[in-house]
Amino acid sequence: IDKIPTDQSSFGTGEIVGRLSAAVSEDTSVTYVKLNKNFAYIYDGTNTDSVNPPNVGQLPEGTLDYYKSEWDEYYVTTSGKRFLKEDADLTSGVGMGENPLVVNAIGNMGGDSFIQMALEDRSSFTVTPIGNDYYSGYDGEFNLDDFTATHINITFDNITSVTALPDFDNCTVFSAGEWQQVDVDGVMKFRLVLKLRQPGVYAGNSATYDSEGNLLFKFEILTNDIGNMTIVIDPGHGVTEYGYDDPGAIGHIEEAGANLAVAKLVESKLKALGVNVVRLKTESEFYDTKRRPYYARDYGCDLYIAIHS
């Protein structure tokens, strides 16, 4: 679209449109894996891959999932997710039992489309783009030549009832949605199927709990005005946690120096076009390599560029 739309919302009625039995009752003692930060790494719990896949999504701080096992630096949950131990804590309790989900509102707010929900317990979920033609390659199973998704699925764990969706008249990113009941590895779950208003036009999502304890999904509204963009540039390698420089590959020059030079050039050209650019100062500050995309999220970036050579 050409410009950010005004803030408008459609509100839910609270009418219950689906029910499921609780997977774990309130009289059952359990151990939870509880996330201790937003934008934590989430991995596929059915394999040992060290790369977090795009078909899992991001979960907010406070999310609860049932503990299944652990190995090395990971906790594995019964829903098939795997978390770094540094991103989560183990806590004892009883099963969630009845855990209703109420859809409060859908609309646009502050340059994002949003969906606001109320949950009794902060159960986990999975956000998955549907309609992409992935293929396997050197970097794994999720290589793409083009982003062609038509729908976004949000599959909720341990939810026992859901309410009717408001209309999508005031939602720019999605044109429609519906609740489905699906069987995931023998467990019945609710899935929210969201139809993209423009196929292939999707910039990901964030999920956090707001000040009133509501689950808030945000989906950035993309515009044709490059001046609305924030781009974070990450020159590869640089200062390590021990204070010395990581040069990267070494040939006639050091890779880190080449990366920094290219990053500064890209930064200057983008700024000349009116883009808000943030360059990570990897030449003077330490940024954990695995978490650099998450540092970028703190700037509300629309595009993250990691430069290597």
Question: Residue ranges of each PLM-predicted region?
Answer:
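Active-site histidine-acidic residue metal-binding/catalytic motifs
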Residues: 214-295, 299-301
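Histidine- and/or cysteine-centered catalytic micro-motif in compact active-site loops
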Residues: 282, 308-309
